[in-house]
From Swiss-Prot:
Ranges in coiled-coil conformation: none
Molecular function as annotated in GO: toxin activity
Keyword Phosphoprotein: no
Cleaved propeptide residues: 22-46
Signal peptide (from-to): 1-21
Main subcellular localisation: secreted
Keywords for the protein's UniProt record, in alphabetical order: Cleavage on pair of basic residues, Disulfide bond, Nematocyst, Secreted, Signal, Toxin
Function: Probable toxin with unknown function. In contrast to similar toxins, this toxin does not inhibit voltage-gated potassium channels (tested at 100 nM). Does not show antimicrobial activities against bacteria and yeasts.
Protein name: U-actitoxin-Oulsp2
Tree of life domain: Eukaryota
Compartmental location: Secreted; Nematocyst
Limits of the ShKT domain: 48-82
Organism ancestry: Eukaryota, Metazoa, Cnidaria, Anthozoa, Hexacorallia
Length: 82
């Protein structure tokens, strides 16, 4: 009975070590890459475009409404947020 208990304990210890060693976030270089990625605003860099029609964004810029968060995001190209 004791040998079975020892074998079960060793197998569970090996399983625990293998699971915790493969968790994301243990690699410092990868964590640093995530931090720099979060600091950037990739949604403006990847696709700098207007989500609203061109006429709407032109009117927003003409009326100086680019400071509104709604238009700052949806008319990013026209308002110069890229």
């Amino acid at each position: 009975m004791n040998t079975k208990l020892v074998v079960v304990f060793l197998l569970s210890a090996i399983l625990f070590v293998s699971v915790t060693a493969s968790r994301p976030g243990k690699d410092l270089e990868r964590d640093e890459a995530y931090e720099t990625y979060d600091d950037e605003r990739p949604y403006f860099k990847r696709a700098c475009k207007d989500n609203l029609p061109a006429a709407t964004c032109s009117n927003v810029k003409a009326n100086n409404n680019c400071s509104s968060e709604k238009y700052k995001t949806n008319c990013a190209k026209t308002c110069g947020e890229c």
